[in-house]
């Protein structure tokens, strides 16, 4: 039964077993060799050798999350355009038209976001409606 497996399958199983064993070994050694001090000082926050002051709960602006979402949305286009550029000769004009439509759709989305003010950092311009 086991002889029917290809050598690559055995290599994959050995790799997975080795990775699992290494993870368990590191977790086990950390548990055995690690310190177990409990107390009031253990639960205090520590920042680069300086005692912290104030609250650690800072409020961040939603603008950073907006920029992160826009980066993810418009950053996804790069792998598609790279793959298109690599296979340009094989795809011909059909691939060129598809890539042009893809980039055009992304540009329409970018212009829409600019029009509604999603790319502006000032709150008064962002409240503008798209039909104004």
Curated annotation (Swiss-Prot):
The keyword Cell membrane applies. The keyword Chaperone does not apply. It catalyses: a quinone + NADH + 5 H(+)(in) = a quinol + NAD(+) + 4 H(+)(out). The chain crosses the membrane at residues 10-30, 66-86, 93-113. It comes from Pseudomonas aeruginosa (strain ATCC 15692 / DSM 22644 / CIP 104116 / JCM 14847 / LMG 12228 / 1C / PRS 101 / PAO1). Belongs to the complex I subunit 3 family. The gene is nuoA1. Its EC number is 7.1.1.-. It is a multi-pass membrane protein. It is an enzyme of class 7 (translocase). This is NADH-quinone oxidoreductase subunit A 1. Pfam families: Oxidored_q4. It is found in: Cell inner membrane.
């Amino acid at each position: 039964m086991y002889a029917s497996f290809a050598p690559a399958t055995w290599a994959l199983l050995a790799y997975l077993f080795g990775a699992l064993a290494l993870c368990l070994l590191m977790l086990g050694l950390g548990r055995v060799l690690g310190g177990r001090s409990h107390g009031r000082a253990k639960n205090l926050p520590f920042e680069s050798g300086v005692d912290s002051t104030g609250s650690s709960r800072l409020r961040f602006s939603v603008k950073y999350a907006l920029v992160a979402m826009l980066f993810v949305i418009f950053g996804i286009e790069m792998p598609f355009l790279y793959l298109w550029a690599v296979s340009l000769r094989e795809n011909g004009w059909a691939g060129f038209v598809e890539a042009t439509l893809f980039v055009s759709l992304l540009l329409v989305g970018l212009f829409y976001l600019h029009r509604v003010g999603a790319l502006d950092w000032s709150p008064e311009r962002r409240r503008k409606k798209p039909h104004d």
